[in-house]
A protein has these predicted regions:
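A cross-kingdom feature that marks ATP-driven nucleic-acid transaction machinery
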Residues: 1-17, 50, 54, 66, ...
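Interdomain motor-coupling "hinge/lid" segment immediately C-terminal to the ATP-binding subdomain
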Residues: 2-10, 123, 129-238
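Hydrophobic anchor at the beta1->P-loop junction of P-loop NTPases
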Residues: 36
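Walker A (P-loop) phosphate-binding loop of P-loop NTPases
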Residues: 40-41
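Conserved lysine of the Walker
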Residues: 44-45
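Short glycine-rich substrate-engagement loop in P-loop NTPases that contacts/grips substrate
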Residues: 58-90
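Structural recognition of the conserved hydrophobic beta-strand(s) that form the central parallel beta-sheet
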Residues: 92, 117-123, 143
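Accessory nucleic acid-recognition modules appended to NTPase machines
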Residues: 195-337
Length: 390
């Protein structure tokens, strides 16, 4: 325990707190048990350490990673109980999905150690509700995404820009500070390597490929009990998607291409989406049926397009991927039967600066979203502005 505490304290002391992500202010940190899930690489660990460093006393706090070798000979519950007996008040557990039987032991901690507050992180494929009904009533679940364009500017330039609502964006009310006279250069930089907080690291593209590989080879198979053979098929499927997006999925064709049972493909797509690798755009059916069929499949974010595509990503694909990625954090985004996207009653057509109004002429409330323009007018909105929504 002493060594575990020392490692925890050292990590906390080294944590950079200069920039705080959007999720930092959304989590009710005083809740007794909270889980933060999200794709690999989006900064969940850093967020925990920042909160500890800025708000808690280290003597009351323990941060552990569930994949630590320490847990080869110790249980989570045993560790939590000993820490609580020593006066500990706040336990932070990273990578909870790496610990077998995590749900049972967290329930034991909750029920038997009422003075101990627990915050833990997990993979986004982790289903906190699967087989853990008792735990799900005790824990608050938050999902964290990668950097918005707004956050990227904050991290890269140290410039704080307020969040803009969708109404402010479509009314062309997004105002950038004077330090950013021309946003397009930064925007194109973001599309290439701005979504993940480790964008400044050497070998960014290599690390991003490692994130994808670990998700497909470890996270998804571990959760779904897939064999090594299935994990290989997931990698093949990922490459097919990367080279084809955006596309309307034909399950029979894809199944033939990668030699899998077509009946398994919807499950593969769902898990890859939950893991933050792809995004599926549905038609809106409304009513009790909820989500309609999948109309298009995209990579989750534009950085993945640059990292995984075997050629230069299509510019139209980049534009649509960016819009879908940024807007679905706070909004339900659906396929438009006459254009590209729908949010509530608003229709959005995405294109370059020469894009015309024809596509949305019959829309109840239509907007043209243009890349390569700095400012908008009327129902013409610059694409980069949609990166200010979180």
């Amino acid at each position: 325990m002493e060594l575990l505490k020392q490692l925890s304290d050292n990590l906390i002391k080294r944590t950079d707190t200069r920039y705080l992500r959007y999720m930092y202010h959304q989590i009710p940190w005083s809740n007794r048990m909270t889980v933060l899930v999200g794709p690999r690489g989006v900064g969940k660990t850093t967020l925990l350490l920042q909160y500890i460093k800025l708000n808690l006393q280290m003597k009351d706090t323990l941060y552990v990673s569930a994949e630590s070798i320490y847990f080869a000979n110790h249980t989570l519950f045993e560790t939590a109980m000993k820490f609580s007996q020593l006066g500990g008040k706040h336990l932070f557990i990273d990578e909870i999905h790496k610990y077998k039987g995590w749900a049972t032991e967290l329930k034991m901690i909750y029920d038997n150690l009422p003075t101990l507050q627990v915050v833990f992180t997990g993979s986004s494929v982790l289903d906190i509700y699967k087989g853990t009904a008792d735990l799900s009533r005790r824990v608050l679940v938050f999902t964290m995404q990668g950097l918005s364009f707004r956050e990227y500017i904050g991290m890269e330039k140290g410039i704080d820009i307020p969040v803009s609502t969708l109404e402010q964006i479509v009314n062309n009310e997004v105002v950038l500070p004077e330090e950013i006279e021309h946003p397009l250069a930064l925007f194109h930089e973001y599309l290439c390597k701005g979504y993940y907080p480790f964008s400044k690291d050497e070998g960014y593209r290599m690390r991003l490929n490692q994130v994808v590989s670990m998700t497909l080879e470890t996270d998804i198979p571990q959760y779904a009990n897939y064999t090594v053979m299935v994990s290989r098929k997931l990698k093949e499927l990922m490459q097919v998607i990367a080279d084809s997006v955006p596309f309307k999925p034909n399950m029979s064709t894809i199944a033939t291409t990668i030699k899998v049972d077509r009946n398994n493909l919807p499950d593969y797509f769902e898990l890859m989406e939950r893991a933050g690798l792809i995004a599926q755009l549905h038609e809106s059916t409304g009513g009790v049926r909820g989500l309609g069929k999948v109309e298009k499949v995209y990579l989750d974010n534009t950085n993945l397009s640059f990292a995984l595509s075997s050629s230069m990503p299509d510019i139209g694909n980049q534009r649509e991927t960016f819009f879908f990625n940024q807007m679905r954090v706070n909004h339900a985004v659906f396929n438009s039967p006459i254009s590209d996207f729908m949010i509530e009653d608003k229709t959005f057509e995405i294109g370059g600066k020469k894009k015309g109004q024809k596509q949305i002429s019959e829309a109840k409330e239509g907007y043209i979203v243009k890349d390569d323009i700095e400012t908008g007018m009327g129902n013409v909105i610059p694409l980069w502005a949609f990166g200010m929504n979180y």
